[in-house]
């Protein structure tokens, strides 16, 4: 059975003001192999440097964000971890991509009273090297990654209040040199605004890996890079020029990255066009509701991804 796997990355950006432009999704990689894929990731901002933010009753907007930093390394100002476990050792890595993003209008920001209004006041010039981070593979040491900037709104006329950016690095060769991809991956020095910003702070990373495994079925994998804003208007993404078998059931898996998918905002959804009924069909599972698909969680299928620090 042939299956289709799509990684739509990075990122969907949610805000509820007038429409602004990001960069449209563009095909990045296409593969046809016997194998599978895995995605891991973590946040880089929270209300504590080492402990997870567990209070689901508060809005992201009022959280005074600070860098997560769990690696006990004085040379890093931010770091978080995620792990891969129980994959066979004899896998061949076909493609591995690291993505990171953040809302970064200034180094720090705070909510201040101005007359009868509360306004966000930023301070500290932003570090221009948003594409430069540290990457550590299992049992390895930190090495500098200088990735490609997919999108950065800073200094432009769009997204001026929160200045989102997205970066990407191909790390295929680095993972191919590992004896096993099992273990803990650490990403450090991702940049974002600490404190309170309009809409709330957000930053994080994901690592997407496609691997060959002779025991798996044949699959097509297609990845897309970009950043689009989702507000009151729907954003449509059309998958073109991919192949599938002509008869029988075709199983499809879609992996998505999102910024600003607040748990308390229950208005976002993802739908697939069903040609048989002539309309879009909302997606959902045990951990993602139809009307709150992007709910500030990291999941794999029907389960929360818990192999991370902080979790």
Model-based region annotation:
Residues 20-311:
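Disulfide-rich extracellular domains of secreted proteins
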Residues 1-22:
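Bacterial Sec-dependent N-terminal signal peptides
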């Amino acid at each position: 059975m042939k299956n289709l796997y799509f990684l739509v990355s990075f990122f969907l950006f949610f805000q509820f003001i007038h429409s602004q432009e990001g960069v449209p999704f563009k095909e990045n990689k296409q593969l046809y192999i016997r194998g599978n894929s895995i995605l891991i990731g973590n946040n880089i901002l929270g209300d504590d440097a080492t402990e997870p933010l567990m209070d689901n009753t508060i809005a992201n907007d009022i959280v005074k964000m600070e860098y997560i930093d769990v690696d006990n390394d004085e040379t890093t100002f931010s770091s978080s971890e995620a792990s891969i476990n129980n994959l066979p050792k004899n896998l061949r890595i076909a493609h591995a991509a690291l993505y990171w993003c953040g809302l970064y209008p200034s180094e720090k920001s705070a909510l201040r009273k101005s007359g009868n209004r509360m306004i966000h006041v930023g301070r500290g010039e932003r570090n221009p090297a948003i594409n430069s981070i540290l990457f550590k593979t299992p049992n390895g040491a930190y090495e500098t990654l200088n990735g490609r900037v997919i999108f950065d709104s800073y200094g432009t006329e769009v997204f001026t209040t929160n200045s989102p950016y997205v970066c990407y690095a191909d790390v295929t060769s680095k993972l191919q040199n590992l004896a096993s991809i099992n273990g803990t991956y650490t990403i450090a020095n991702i940049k974002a605004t600490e404190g309170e910003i309009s809409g709330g702070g957000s930053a994080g990373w994901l690592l997407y890996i496609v691997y060959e495994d002779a025991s798996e079925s044949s699959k097509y994998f297609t990845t897309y890079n970009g950043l689009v804003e989702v507000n009151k208007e729907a954003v449509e993404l059309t998958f073109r020029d991919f192949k599938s078998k002509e008869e029988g059931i075709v199983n499809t898996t879609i992996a998505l990255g999102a910024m600003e998918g607040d748990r308390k905002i229950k208005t976002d959804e993802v739908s697939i066009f069903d040609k048989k009924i002539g309309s879009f069909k909302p997606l959902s599972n045990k951990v993602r509701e139809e009307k709150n698909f992007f709910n500030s969680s990291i999941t794999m299928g029907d389960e929360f991804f818990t192999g991370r620090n902080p979790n």
